[in-house]
Each structure stands twice: as C-alpha cells, then as structure tokens.
C-alpha cells in the first residue's frame, strides 16, 4: 500500500464534464477514463431525511454526498459498473471537484460511498489516497473520519469534514444511534457503550457506526431516478480524447460554445443566387461529367478494346445527364448516381473479362481460380470507381471556385479579419488544440502564445456573430480521423459534438482529392458489400491504421451562421466554409467505406449528418431511472405523461431525410491520405 501511495501522482486528474451546466452549483459529472465507451461519473446531492429522499445541492447546505454512476454510450445514467482501469485517478478527480465545491459553497462535510466490488480490489488504497489528497490540498482545514473506513464489508466509505466543526453539529450528519449505543456520562466526558458487545467506544466510532447504519439502507438507484442531464454535455463528454488540459481558456470557451449555434440570424452570403444557380446548372454538370473518362480506365485495365473507349465515355455521360437534371452538382446523390452508373457499365463487361482471366489459372482448382479472379476484379473495380469520382468531384467543385475567389469580405471588421486569417493560415492547429483541450501551456511547441490564441478565438467568435448564411441545399464535406472508442459512442448516440471550429469545403474533397477516400461507400448496397470489408456498415475494420477514417457529408449548414472566407482572406482553392465551434450534428446514415484494392486496406466510414441548432436540442431531460434500470429503456418524466425517447432520434429534427439504398458505392471512395490537417482536425 505504501508503494502505491508513493507512486501516486496527486496532480493526475482525468477530464471531467459537467453534464448539467445550467445548475448554479455544478453537481453531475462524467469522468473521461481512457477510451472506454462507457464512462464513470458522479452526482453531488444531499438527503432530506434518514431515508432515500435526495435532492440537488443548494446554497446553505452543509452535508454533501457523492454518488458514483456509469454514463452509458447511449447517454443514459446507470448504476456504477466500475471505475475504469485506474480507480485511484478517478478518486483523485472526484475529490478535486469535491474540495473545490466544499470550499466555494462553504460545505462542512462530504461523503463518498462506493461498492468495494467496483474498486478492482483497491478500496483501501482509495481511502489512503483520499486521506493524502485532503491533507495536502486543504491546508489542514479538512480531515477524514478514519473510524468509518473498516465499518462495512460491502461498502468503502470516505467522509471528509471541516476540522474545526464537530461532526454531530453538521446538519445532515445523523445523530448517534440509540439503537446501537448507550450514552454514559463520566468524569472525562460522554462515553458510548456498544449495546451488542458492551465495549466502550469513542464518540467518533459511534458517529461512524451511526452514519454507516443510515447509509447502508440507501440505494444508488434512488439518486439516479429523475436525474437531469444536458444532451449537449453528454455529446461533449463522449467526444473527448483520452487526455486534455482543462486550462481556464478551455473552460471559458467550452462554456460559451452553445451561443454560437443558435438559429442563423445573419444575411445570406452576397453571392447566394450565383451559388444556387451554378450548383444546379446543366452546363456545369455537363462540364464536370466530361472529366469522367471511364472508357480509358476500362481500356487500361484490359476490360474493353481501344475502339470502345469513346463509346463507354458517351454512354456514362448521357445516362448521368438524363438522371441528374436540376440536381446539385456536388450533392451526395449526384456522386452516388455517377458511381452507380460506372459500376453498372463495368458489370456489362465482367463476364468476358472473367472468362479471359480465369483461363490463365488452369493449374488451380475451380474454386481457387474463381476466388483469385474475383478478388482481382474487385480490386480493379474499386480503383476505377475511385478514379472517376475523384475526377468528377474536382471538376464539379472547381465550378464553384469563382464565387469563392471573388468573395467580398468587407463586412468583417479588421479584428474579425485578423482572426479569420490566423485560423485559415498556420494558426488553426493552435486554435483548435486549445478548444479540444490539447494545448499544453507548459510546452511551447505552438506558433501562437496562449494570449494570441485566446484573442484569435474571440475574434473568430465575433466574426461568426457578424457572419453570413448559406442558401438551403448546399452540401459540405470534411474528413476526420477518430479514435475507435469515440466512433463507437457516436454510433450508439447518433450525434457528434465538434469542440473546435469546423473546416469544411464546398466541393467533395473526401473523394480522393485529399484525405479519406470514401468512393466505395456510394455503391448500391448489394454491389458495395461485395468489395467493402465491413458488412455491417457501422462496425470496425482491422487495418494498418488504428484510427477510423470519417468522410463527413454535412447538410443543414444554412441553419447556423457560418464564415466563408474566400477573396483576400483565405486560399480560394480550398473553397473553405468554417462552421462554428460547439457544433452538434445528428448522424442520419453511416455507410462502410472500407476497401481493399490490392495494395491498401482501409477503415473508412461515410457519414451523412445534419447540423442541429440549440433550439433543436432539448438541453435537459428528467429520466425515469427506475424504468431504465428495470427495462433498459429510456423514458422521460413529464409530470403524469411518459414520453419514450428513441436514441436513433436522440436529438429532435423536423427534417425527415430519405436515405437512398444505393448510397453504398460512394462511401468507399473516401480518401484521407493527403488532406490539409484543418479539414481533419477534431
């Protein structure tokens, strides 16, 4: 035990998220432990009687209870399942918050009760560590009631109290039980006799036994029932990296993020009409389709003879023109249609190609030869579809370039322009790292100083408030690499929270032009599944990359104020649209985009998501904890009416989008390999 105590670093606290920030006294938290999908948390509360009746902390309360719980991947609160791989760091983090709360709100006593079975055999070490923390951090003002440590075999108790206040005088601390002890006056003061054993005990021992007697009867379930939590805060807690630096700057901007995601009140961008017209222009579509030279790719792969190259090109172009009139040239539907047409055309020539190639393997048995040739065909098809979508996406996106290049930025103030330039230049890494909690002020490896970063974020926030609005129907694209644990939480929760400013592009930059190649993800399902790796769409793929590559397709950006730099403020070739920090998106569709083209095995996903404003989020909900623990189903408490909450619609949206079954092809063409970092960071 001494060894563990000495090795313990009392400065090692884990990231903590306030799950109900509207409360004047913060009192419900999640603790981010490594990269687990389910995270431990805790609630601060007080009891109004000797039973299970509990309530939120209020000003003037003198006794506080800490009740541990588990925050599930779906965003619900359940009984504690465990403290993660490092129970000691959890306790350190919990008591850091507890001590701050006690000092700030003048609370005299605080108690944690935890099942010993959930401490990974470290119950005593946890008590010792708590004692050390209190002694080192309270300056001698608080002490532990050590007489409570060994009272109970089931629970580990830790009770802290103000040193100069008698425990029996603190409201909320039970009186010494007359069932357990007899009080006897003596020359040295009051002494207590244990009624069962007849032994004399100290006053602290009698108080400890009385506290344990009262609290042993209480259930954590009673505390979990009717707990209020913020949906935004849940998404925040589940988008955390495994470590972060909660500097005052991080806390400042975390608290104000929701303000930037109110419904858009800015005017439409100055070239709104031109953007809409070009996006749906037949001429722009025809020009972009001219870049689809699948005939050449077919010929180079020995699928067709040279004299059929121009015929194939014309066939694909005509079919696409017929099916895509009036459709936005950069929409996911357009890319999906093109990928599907290329794939259908490939299938027409598969039989002859297959026969020619299988004859080359006459030395193999039939099954082995078929498998070998089929794998070769899948690799060829994957490369061709990726190539054609890459060419189309680049040409279609470039049609919008004049709008960005000639963008008028006169509406922004000099300070706002400076903030935008710093972000779109080399400062975006430092700015977003500070917002993500990855900026370490003690390690100067950045370009900007802490004060420069804070000023830049303030200027950018101001630019968003003075920003502009996109017309409806514009699709934005972005790539991202994500920890598997965060990805899995997003899959279950169906929402994702961006702490940082979100760099997106007007053109489909995720299809081979930069980073995560998602092309296979837009194939029709029955065809995509023959070449993609994960057949369940939302699972994880074993690849050389331990991160999940995400190709974001984001709609609904017209709902919030945005910044479209362009002109003199940003490189126009990126066609960047910056979305506000603190953005939440609802995940409408996840399509597997993994592929194996013979040289690379990827772990990519194509995700269609929709921007949600603060008004589309119900920030706090009261959940029926009894029903949750009995059935696993989340039910909200609204007086006498119970509303069932479907986690697939965890955030409410009035927009119902039809999900096309043929989306699969395009997902596999996501390409993350060479994209600028700001389109990936987050």
From Swiss-Prot:
Thermal characteristics: Optimum temperature is 20 degrees Celsius.
**Where along the sequence does the record put site: Cleavage?**
6-7, 619-620
Q: Which GO terms describe its molecular function?
A: NAD+-protein-arginine ADP-ribosyltransferase activity; nucleotidyltransferase activity
What reaction is this protein's catalytic activity?
L-arginyl-[protein] + NAD(+) = N(omega)-(ADP-D-ribosyl)-L-arginyl-[protein] + nicotinamide + H(+)
GO CC annotation terms, alphabetical: extracellular region; virion component
Can you tell me which residues form the catalytic site?
A: 478, 503, 576
**Ranges where the TR mART core domain occurs:** 383-614
EC number in record: 2.4.2.31
Localization, per the record, is: Virion
Q: Which UniProt keywords apply?
A: Glycosyltransferase, NAD, Nucleotidyltransferase, Transferase, Virion
In its record, the post-translational modification comment is:
Proteolytic cleavages at the N- and C-termini by the prohead core protein protease give rise to the mature enzyme.
What does the pH dependence annotation say? Optimum pH is 7.5.
> What CDD domains has UniProt attached to this entry?
VIP2 (cd00233)
Q: What biological processes does GO assign it?
A: regulation of viral transcription
> Which top EC class is named for this enzyme in its record?
transferase
Q: What is its main location?
A: virion
Q: Which Pfam families match?
A: ADPrib_exo_Tox
Annotated family: Belongs to the Tevenvirinae NAD(+)--arginine ADP-ribosyltransferase family.
The record's section on HAMAP family has: ALT_T4 (MF_04139)
Q: What is the purpose of this protein?
A: ADP-ribosyltransferase that efficiently ADP-ribosylates one of the two alpha subunits of host RNA polymerase RPOA on an arginine located in the C-terminal region. ADP-ribosylation of RPOA alpha subunit enhances the transcription of viral early genes. Also ribosylates RPOA subunits beta, beta' and sigma 70 and performs an autoribosylation reaction. Additional in-vitro identified targets include proteins involved in either translation or cellular metabolism such as elongation factor-Tu or GroeL. Mono-ADP-ribosylates host MAZF which may inactivate the latter.
| Protein name per its UniProtKB record | NAD(+)--arginine ADP-ribosyltransferase
Look up and give the organism this protein is from: Enterobacteria phage T4
Q: What is the lineage of its organism?
A: Viruses, Duplodnaviria, Heunggongvirae, Uroviricota, Caudoviricetes
Q: Which gene encodes it?
A: alt
């Amino acid at each position: 035990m001494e060894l563990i105590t000495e090795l313990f670093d009392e400065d090692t606290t884990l990231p903590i998220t306030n799950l109900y920030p509207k409360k004047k006294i913060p009192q419900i938290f999640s603790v981010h432990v490594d990269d687990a999908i389910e995270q431990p948390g805790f609630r601060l509360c007080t009891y109004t009687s000797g039973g299970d009746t509990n309530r939120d902390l209020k000003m003037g309360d003198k006794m506080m209870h800490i009740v541990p719980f588990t925050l599930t991947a779906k965003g619900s609160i359940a009984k504690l399942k465990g403290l993660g791989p490092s129970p000691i760091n959890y306790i350190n983090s919990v008591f850091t918050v507890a001590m701050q709360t006690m000092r700030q709100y003048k609370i005299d006593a605080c108690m944690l009760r935890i099942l010993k079975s959930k401490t990974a055999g470290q119950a005593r070490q946890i008590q010792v560590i708590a004692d050390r923390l209190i002694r080192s951090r309270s300056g001698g003002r608080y002490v532990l009631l050590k007489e409570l440590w060994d009272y109970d075999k089931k629970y580990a108790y830790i009770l802290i109290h103000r040193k100069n206040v008698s425990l029996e005088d603190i409201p909320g601390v039970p009186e010494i039980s007359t069932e357990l002890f007899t009080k006897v006056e003596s020359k040295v003061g009051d002494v207590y006799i244990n009624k069962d054993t007849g032994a004399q005990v100290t006053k602290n021992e009698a108080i400890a036994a009385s506290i344990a007697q009262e609290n042993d009867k209480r259930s954590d379930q009673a505390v979990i029932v009717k707990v209020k939590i913020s949906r935004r805060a849940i998404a925040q807690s589940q988008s955390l990296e495994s470590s972060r630096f909660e500097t005052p700057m991080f806390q400042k901007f975390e608290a104000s993020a929701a303000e930037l995601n109110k419904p858009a009140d800015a005017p439409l961008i100055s070239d709104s009409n031109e953007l809409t017209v070009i996006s749906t222009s037949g001429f722009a579509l025809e020009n972009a389709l001219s870049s689809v030279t699948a005939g050449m790719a077919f010929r180079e792969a020995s699928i067709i003879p040279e004299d059929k190259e121009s015929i194939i090109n014309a066939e694909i172009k005509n079919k696409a023109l017929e099916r895509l009139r009036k459709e936005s040239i950069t929409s996911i539907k357009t890319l999906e249609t093109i990928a599907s047409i290329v794939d259908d055309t490939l299938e027409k020539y598969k039989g002859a190609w297959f026969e020619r190639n299988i004859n080359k393997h006459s030395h193999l048995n039939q099954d082995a030869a078929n498998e070998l040739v089929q794998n070769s065909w899948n690799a060829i098809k994957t490369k061709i579809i990726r190539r054609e979508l890459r060419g189309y996406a680049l040409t279609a996106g470039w049609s919008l370039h004049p709008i960005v290049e000639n963008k008028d930025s006169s509406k922004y103030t000099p300070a706002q322009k400076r903030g935008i330039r710093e972000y779109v230049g080399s400062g975006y890494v430092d700015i977003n790292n500070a917002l993500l909690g990855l900026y370490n002020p003690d390690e100067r490896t950045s370009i900007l100083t802490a004060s420069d970063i804070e000023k830049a974020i303030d200027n950018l926030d101001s630019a968003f408030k003075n920003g502009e609005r996109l017309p409806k129907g514009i699709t934005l694209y972005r790539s991202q690499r994500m920890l598997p644990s965060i990805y899995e939480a997003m899959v279950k929760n169906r929402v994702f929270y961006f702490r940082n400013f979100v760099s997106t592009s007007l053109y489909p930059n995720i299809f081979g032009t930069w980073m995560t190649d998602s092309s296979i993800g837009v194939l029709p399902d029955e065809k995509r599944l023959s070449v993609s790796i994960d057949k369940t769409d939302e699972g994880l793929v074993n690849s050389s990359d331990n991160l999940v590559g995400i190709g974001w397709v984001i709609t609904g950006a017209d709902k919030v104020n945005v910044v479209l730099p362009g002109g003199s403020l940003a490189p126009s070739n990126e066609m960047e649209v910056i979305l506000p920090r603190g953005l939440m998106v609802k995940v409408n569709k996840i399509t597997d985009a993994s592929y194996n083209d013979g040289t690379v095995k990827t772990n990519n996903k194509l995700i269609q998501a929709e921007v949600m404003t603060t008004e589309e989020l119900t920030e706090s909900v009261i959940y029926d904890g009894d029903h949750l623990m009995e059935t696993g189903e989340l039910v909200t408490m609204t007086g006498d009416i119970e509303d069932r909450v479907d986690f697939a619609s965890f955030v409410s949206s009035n927009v119902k989008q039809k999900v096309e079954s043929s989306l699969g092809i395009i997902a596999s063409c996501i390409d993350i390999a060479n994209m600028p970092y700001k389109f990936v960071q987050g």
